[in-house]
Regions:
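Peri-transmembrane interface segments
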Residues: 16-28, 239-297, 306-308
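C-terminal membrane-exit region of the final transmembrane helix in multipass inner-membrane proteins
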Residues: 2-4, 11, 380-418
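Short helix-loop junctions at transmembrane helix boundaries
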Residues: 329, 344-389, 400-404, 408
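A hydrophobic alpha-helix feature that marks transmembrane segments and, especially
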Residues: 42-50, 281-319, 327-330, 402-403
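A structural signal for hydrophobic secondary-structure junctions
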Residues: 82, 86-224
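N-terminal Sec/SRP start-transfer signal
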Residues: 1-38, 418
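Transmembrane alpha-helical interface segments in multi-pass membrane proteins
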Residues: 304, 311-357
Length: 418
């Protein structure tokens, strides 16, 4: 292949000369198609990965990657209690790649002001006791999205979303009554100390965050009784493996009060959200296939023009004894320079555009429709490498068949015509 590469290189650098300028427009079109295709594919992959990570993070922030709950629960926020000891938390937090574990308790209710009311999910978290394996607690998620005030520090303090704040005209410092209905109506007075905004409207409009002891008091639970345990992990791709380990340690086993424990991961808790996210993968495949088809068509056109533009050269080499395989390899090498050049520029432009969006959030989005306020970007160098290697290999494979036109070029006819 050394001779083929050398000849292809000389032909490539001769393309700007006067006698080769007839083929330059077609080559530039093919080059542009490769560049545009690479830019679109890179942006598509990084945006989809970023969007999925944002949604996964927000869903996990309101719940967790894995939850340990009572086996008798019926998938509502009015949960049967389980007894959670410190030793149980330590057994789970000792699992590799677990970020933190924490008790939680939830209870549906109604928030009422003088002029309006709103159904809520009150989620209680410990204010100062958590067994952690890296991150202090589940409050960290809300710290990142807090836009006013601070996190709760006392038993009667809560944070609400900006959606709920606007709807009910409540601000930091406002007090309100929440009503919880069982056999009889129970009320609690809370003071708002913080307002968060995750742009995830399905959850923002419902969740009020406060002290876990409020739910324990409302339900008449003891100190060790809670709705469940949140288990957050560091790497979402390890969810199945870690879930299996959590199940092996506590799944279908009784707690200290005889309640059987059950584990469920974030996908089981939110099947609709994750089914929707899976559809995004299909969109990526469709876009990549379209870009490959468009770029492939232009690359094939460029190769054919390169061959037809060099028929005299091909005829001379055939007359000197060069076989068809040798000549096809020359032009495949020459086409590879075009592909590599286009991919290089496509990567440079695509990565620059992604970096601008990542750091400066140039393109905004409507959070009520997309759950994020700007186009999210996540750099995933594994998929980036797969994309580049795959694009190059596919581009070269689709050129093998068109290069067979060289076998139909007769040196006698070409030299006679010239």
């Amino acid at each position: 292949m050394r001779n083929e590469w050398m000849i292809a290189k000389r032909l490539y650098y001769a393309e700007g000369k006067e006698d080769k300028k007839m083929s330059l427009p077609a080559i530039r079109v093919a080059l542009t198609a490769i560049i545009v295709g690479m830019v679109v594919m890179i942006i598509t992959i990084f945006v989809v990965i970023g969007f999925k990570q944002e949604i996964q993070q927000k869903v996990a922030g309101f719940g967790s990657h894995i939850q340990i709950v009572n086996f008798d629960n019926n998938n509502t926020y009015e949960m049967q209690p389980i007894s959670v000891s410190d030793s149980l938390l330590e057994r789970i937090s000792s699992i590799e790649d677990v970020d933190y574990v924490q008790r939680f308790a939830t209870k549906p209710g109604m928030l009422k002001t003088d002029s309006a009311f709103q159904g809520i999910i009150f989620k209680g978290l410990p204010l100062n006791d958590s067994v952690s394996a890296g991150s202090p607690s589940g409050w960290d998620f809300f710290t990142d999205y807090l836009i006013k005030g601070h996190l709760p520090k006392a038993q009667n303090e809560v944070i609400i979303s900006s959606t709920m704040s606007d709807l009910l005209n409540l601000q930091v410092g406002s007090a309100f009554f929440a009503y919880f209905i069982e056999e009889k109506i129970r009320s609690r007075k809370f003071t708002i100390v913080g307002i968060y905004n995750t742009c995830f409207s399905d959850y923002d409009k419902s969740f009020v965050l406060g002290d876990i002891r409020q739910v324990q008091s409302l339900n008449g639970w003891d100190e060790d009784e809670v709705s469940g345990v949140d288990v957050n992990i560091r790497d979402f791709s390890e969810l199945d493996r870690i879930h299996d380990k959590v199940w092996m340690r506590v799944g279908n086993k009784p707690d200290e009060r005889g309640n059987f424990l059950y584990t469920q991961d974030i996908r089981e808790q939110n099947p609709n959200v994750f089914s929707w996210l899976e559809l995004l993968n299909m969109n990526v495949v469709i876009i990549i296939l379209l870009m490959v088809c468009v770029a492939g068509f232009n690359i094939i056109s460029g190769l054919l023009i390169l061959i037809l533009d060099a028929v005299q050269f091909i005829g001379i080499l055939k007359a000197l004894g060069a076989d068809n395989g040798f000549l096809r390899r020359i032009f495949l090498c020459r086409a590879s320079f075009l592909v590599i050049n286009g991919m290089l520029w496509g990567n440079v432009i695509g990565l620059i555009l992604c970096a601008l969006q990542y750091y400066f959030h140039v393109i905004p989005l409507d959070p009520t429709a997309y759950y994020v306020s700007y186009v999210p970007i996540a750099f995933h160098w594994g998929w980036w490498s797969v994309l580049n290697v795959g694009t190059f290999l596919v581009s070269m494979l689709i050129l093998v068949a068109p290069s067979a036109i060289i076998t139909r070029i007769s040196p006698a006819k070409v030299m006679h015509f010239e």
